[in-house]
Amino acid sequence: MFLHSLHLQHFRNYRDQTVQFQAPKTILLGENAQGKTNLLEAVELFSTLRSHRVSRDRDLVQTGAESALLTAVVERDSGEQQLQIQLQQQGRRRVQRDGEVLRRQLDLLGSLCSVQFSSLDLDLVRGGPQQRRVWLDRLLIQLQPIYAHLQQQYGRVLRQRNALLRRAESLDLALLAPLNWQLAQLGVHIMRRRSRAIQRLVPLAAHWHREISGQREQLIVAYQPSVLAPDDTDEAIAWQERMLAQIEARRAAELGQRTSLVGPHRDDLNLSINGTEARLQASQGQQRTLVLSLKLAELELIEAVLGEPPLLLLDDVLAELDLRRQQQLLEAIANRFQTLITTTHLSAFDQSWVETAQILTVQSGHLQSEAVPMAPSSASLHKSLDS
């Protein structure tokens, strides 16, 4: 897939800006707080319907405006599509594809896929379980758009159940029974999908980690569900029964803490290098290698599932990588994936890489083109992939 253009109206610090992407690699050059990351955030919204920076749509709408309008033109193997998201200061979003208003915004998922890599991704290693769950969920939303619907349903049941648990003194336990069943049913659907995604991701990430570490390190990524699958199987009914039994066993603790303690909202991932938990003992260099390996594995997995390469969004990440890791990343992506990369300077880039990139200078929400190589088609991206 290839993103040909973005039109941003009253989005963040962009009042009315059209961006034409005309090369496999686009460098967004500018000082901090000029709008480089905002542009990547717009692409992220089309990919996941979420921002990793804020949770409220009104925070994305330019100050003084009632709404923001984002329009993307994307070329897929099946043809060109126009995607549109309207964000409101007050009220619900509205999404369109090729001029048709979509009844459910989730139906836009899968139209434009991307992998984002920023300095914040180091929290995958050193942060808490929530950071790792969010990363895995964002991947799954693009691999299986139905996953976003499962998450919504699970979140609704979880909130209802927690509201009851907060009334512990006067709670009629019979009210929990139907919610327990729904939580187990939806929770197992989520855990099965997470487990299968990790199974496919692990060999790809392990390969990249060996390559980047010069064959010196072995990466192991282990999914740690809140409820273990019975007898090394992910058969749904047996897993649900085990989750219900665990909920019953934790009833006293849940009533005491007034919150749900069992389910995929308590999952984690264990990341280890050469048998040692990375969060505890990995050096900064090893942590960066690990995250870079996961991101390259994400790219390959999305491409394998969708049959088309996703976009790669690099948000000022080269500053976090030493020269060797930078070179490995740039060699890995080459012209294989359309790449948007933000930076404050060009000195970190190989000159030949800069010469083939489109360079856009970003200043206070305005873009100016510095270099404009010929735009490739989606088919030519596939051709470079096969060569």
UniProtKB/Swiss-Prot annotation:
InterPro entries listed in its UniProt record: DNA-binding_RecF, DNA-binding_RecF_CS, P-loop_NTPase, RecF/RecN/SMC_N, RecF_2
Keyword field contains Ubl conjugation: no
UniProt xrefs under SUPFAM superfamilies: P-loop containing nucleoside triphosphate hydrolases (SSF52540)
Subcellular location: Cytoplasm
A Pfam family matched in the record: SMC_N
Principal localisation: cytoplasm
Any single GO BP term: DNA synthesis involved in DNA repair
Residues binding ATP, per UniProt: G30, E31, N32, A33, Q34, G35, K36, T37
UniProt cross-references to Gene3D superfamilies, sorted A to Z: P-loop containing nucleotide triphosphate hydrolases, RecF/RecN/SMC, N-terminal domain
Keyword Cytoplasm annotated: yes
A Gene Ontology cellular-component term: cytoplasm
Assigned keywords, A-Z: ATP-binding, Cytoplasm, DNA damage, DNA repair, DNA replication, DNA-binding, Nucleotide-binding, SOS response
One Gene Ontology MF term: single-stranded DNA binding
Chain's role: The RecF protein is involved in DNA metabolism; it is required for DNA replication and normal SOS inducibility. RecF binds preferentially to single-stranded, linear DNA. It also seems to bind ATP.
Family: Belongs to the RecF family.
Protein name (Swiss-Prot/TrEMBL): DNA replication and repair protein RecF
